[in-house]
Amino acid sequence: MSAIGIMACSISHDMRHSLTAIYANAELLERHDICASVRDDLLLEIQEAVLAMTERIDSLLQFGSNGRNNPLVHERVSLVVEKAVAAVKFHPDGRNVSITVGEFPPAKAVIDVRNLESAIYNLLLNACQAAARSTQVPEVKVHLAEVDERIYVTILDNGPGIPDSVRTTLFDPFVTAGKPNGTGLGLTLARRVAEEHGGSVCLEKSNRERTVFTLSLTKNRFLPLEDLKSGRAGFEICGNRSANCS
């Protein structure tokens, strides 16, 4: 099936699923014999369905966009990471996950704040969804490191690991293995944003106890789009760090 066909099927399935939940719960809310706690649960499910649809639409818009539309600023990367962590804690998939952060260095870089926050948020959300399937208390850890002219954001989860069958296509659009509520675009978009910042996203490690992703960027280098199209971005950053770099 073509990429357009896969995208159309994916959108149709996800939107129909969310709309069905909204419609069914709205019908139940019309009843006068349900207690307050059940009513609250139904309203929460509607909110989660709307959030899922909004995330799907936002991901598709970002996936289909050409170029960068946000201003570049010289900013502390730690502030962006902290905002992404705070945001994912409010997501339904992040509420019951223990998210801990290490001590962040005050490293600055020339960045697209909005897109970089979105990329880190996507990685965090994936980690939370994986950790939720752990047989232990679900945990996600975030570390930030500065090495010469590069900055690394590392995200660890204690989920069951990534299946070998999808590792070669992990960064392809619409790969949703183990994520029934995922858009299948999070890693694709995170990789694109990292490459725009002169870096990449790597799967450093994945087994039954831990999965580790690292997003890297270069402090003072923001690649022009023509360099990205040539396919040169990313490999020099992570090429020696992982066999699963993209």
Question: What are these model-derived regions, one by one?
Answer:
Residues 1-12:
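Conserved HAMP-HisKA connector
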Residues 40-91:
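Conserved DHp (HisKA) dimerization/phosphotransfer helix of two-component histidine kinases, i.e.
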Residues 66-70, 108-111, 177:
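Conserved micro-motifs of the catalytic ATP-binding
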Residues 96-108:
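Conserved catalytic submotifs in the C-terminal HATPase_c
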Residues 162-174:
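Short conserved segment of the HATPase_c
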Residues 186, 190:
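Short alpha-helical Gxxx[C/S/T] motif in the catalytic ATP-binding
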